[in-house]
């Protein structure tokens, strides 16, 4: 049986805004983001700048309206 993968949290899920630039969702991604070296900086739902903390083992980001997301929650191998 195939398990359904859970939806991404609102701050980094598919939304109206690009999580790296704050522009429209269909805008180009910065090179560092394409390589996976950049954490999301803007909420995908509302475009607000998020509070971001980078750690040696990942990052967390928090939108004042849509909550908290941690990179360890997004990695299915952990």
Swiss-Prot record:
Q: How is the cofactor bound?
A: Probably contains an unusual Fe-S cluster.
Provide one Gene Ontology biological process annotation. biotin biosynthetic process
Keyword Iron recorded:
yes
Q: If researchers knock out this gene, what phenotype do they report?
A: The deletion mutant is unable to grow without extrabacterial biotin. The growth defect of the deletion mutant in biotin-free media can be complemented with biotin but not with another intermediate of the biotin synthesis pathway.
A single Gene Ontology MF term assigned here is: metal ion binding
Q: What are the protein's UniProt keywords?
A: Biotin biosynthesis, Iron, Iron-sulfur, Metal-binding
Q: What does this protein do?
A: Required for the activity of the biotin synthase BioB.
Q: What is this protein called?
A: Biotin synthase auxiliary protein
Species annotation: Mycolicibacterium smegmatis (strain ATCC 700084 / mc(2)155)
Lineage of the source organism?
Bacteria, Bacillati, Actinomycetota, Actinomycetes, Mycobacteriales
